[in-house]
UniProtKB/Swiss-Prot annotation:
InterPro entries listed in its UniProt record: dGTPase (IPR006261), Diverse_Catalytic_Enzymes (IPR051094), dNTPase_2 (IPR023023), HD/PDEase_dom (IPR003607), HD_domain (IPR006674), PHydrolase_assoc_dom (IPR026875)
SMART domains: HDc
Similarity comment text for this entry: Belongs to the dGTPase family. Type 2 subfamily.
Pfam family, one: HD_assoc
Domain HD: 76-203
Database matches in PROSITE patterns: HD
Keywords of this entry: Hydrolase
Name of the featured protein: Deoxyguanosinetriphosphate triphosphohydrolase-like protein
GO MF annotation: an example: triphosphoric monoester hydrolase activity
NCBIfam families: dGTP_triPase, PRK01286.1-1
Length: 381
């Protein structure tokens, strides 16, 4: 016995809420393909992202701490996998399409540069007069054109609903009108959940990594009311455990509290606003009503916690020094390839006439891992 494609579709529909995005409502693909016998469209999207070259490179790209400082801290891939896990959990609990949320989550950081946000900042500056650079747009470029794995189309040919979920910011994107569609209808709930899962994941794991690195101390953390509340509860419940276990338990509890609040508040908003279909979600979006959000109480605490991390962790002198180093490497490589375009790999070089030298260099450098960028940089100095 096995489930046919039709069986799988019926099984999916039976488990989805009426306002979820089903496989039969995926928006189609830019290039027509024969449907798979045993995998639904968003499952195929997930697998295509997982097998992409850009995804493999994420394991050697900085999340917060430059890869060379240690291997026990999050990199861009481990962060992405954590976001995907949270997205699946939240989507499933709300009767949404977990395959769609997971696909969006797995693809959301494909466009990130080496050296984390420092890399994006310097590339954005270098490209400001040449079309700009922004990692969400770069993720779209990767899945729609840069990846070369299939004989019948460029990119990964993902479903339009998956692509819409990657459009986190209101920026122009050619050649499609997908962004206009998102502006008119808003993102799916599945897409909004992937966005919020990203925020939960990086906030929680940055606390853990910052504490492990010695940049955050319990005294510092206790200055934040949200952390202090959770930590004191854990301390009261687990009186005989050591500090390391207690801190990690508090981080898990913090994550769980945000996830639970998000699920409960979205459920409340769906009920309060009598959401019965995706059309209802579109109507509410146009009215400025956002269904996917934390409760006011947790949202306020979460904002304070993120500001606390900005002040106490992200602006730490060691991280600033790491960021400055990353910017120096990328700026040096960019300048080198501008002067020596013949050194650009053929797979990129062949696009220069079509897309400009600046854009091709931006694509090439943005796609590098930290250690590959460092290797080239060191060979030039």
């Amino acid at each position: 016995m096995y489930f046919s494609r039709n069986d799988l579709i019926q099984k999916e529909i039976a488990g989805l809420a009426p306002y979820a995005i089903s496989s039969t409502n995926n928006g189609g693909r830019f290039y027509e393909e024969e449907e798979h016998s045993y995998r639904l469209p968003f499952q195929r999207d997930r697998d295509r992202v997982l097998h992409s070259s850009a995804f493999k490179r994420l394991q050697y790209k900085t999340q917060v701490f430059i890869f060379s400082v240690g291997e026990n801290y999050r990199n861009r891939m481990t962060h992405t996998l954590e976001v995907a896990g949270l997205s699946r959990t939240i989507a499933s609990a709300l009767g949404l399409n977990s395959h769609l949320s997971e696909s969006i989550a797995l693809a959301h950081d494909l466009g990130h540069t080496p050296f984390g946000h420092a890399g994006q900042e310097i590339l954005s500056s270098l490209m400001k007069d040449h079309g700009g650079f922004e990692h969400n747009k770069q993720s779209l470029r990767i899945v729609t054109s840069i990846e070369k794995k299939y004989p019948n189309f460029p990119g990964l040919n993902l479903c339009r609903e998956t692509l819409k979920g990657l459009m986190k910011h209101g920026t122009e994107y050619d050649p499609s009108m997908m962004l206009l569609e998102r502006k008119e209808s808003g993102p799916s709930l599945e897409g909004m959940i992937a966005d919020l899962s990203d925020e939960i994941a990086y906030t929680s794991h940055d606390i853990e990594d910052g504490w492990e690195m010695g940049y955050l101390h319990l005294g510092d953390l206790s200055e934040n009311p949200f952390w202090k509340e959770v930590y004191e509860e854990c301390k009261e419940q687990y009186k005989d455990v050591g500090e390391k276990i207690l801190v990690r338990t508090a981080i898990r509890t913090l994550t769980n509290s945000m996830v639970s609040d998000l699920i409960q508040n979205i459920s409340l908003q769906l009920e309060t606003n009598q959401v019965k279909s995706t059309e209802d979600l579109i109507r509410l979006w146009k009215q400025g009503i956002r269904i996917a959000s934390f409760s006011e109480r947790v949202d306020s605490k979460f904002r304070e916690l993120k500001f606390f991390l900005y002040e106490k962790l992200y602006r730490h002198e060691d991280l600033v020094r790491m960021s400055d180093y990353g910017k120096k490497v990328i700026e040096s490589l960019f300048d080198y390839f501008l002067k020596h375009p013949e050194k650009i790999p053929d797979t990129y070089k062949e696009r220069i006439e079509e897309e400009s030298l600046y854009r091709v260099i931006s694509d090439y450098v943005a796609g590098m891992t930290d250690r590959y960028a460092e290797k080239i940089y060191q060979s030039l100095h």
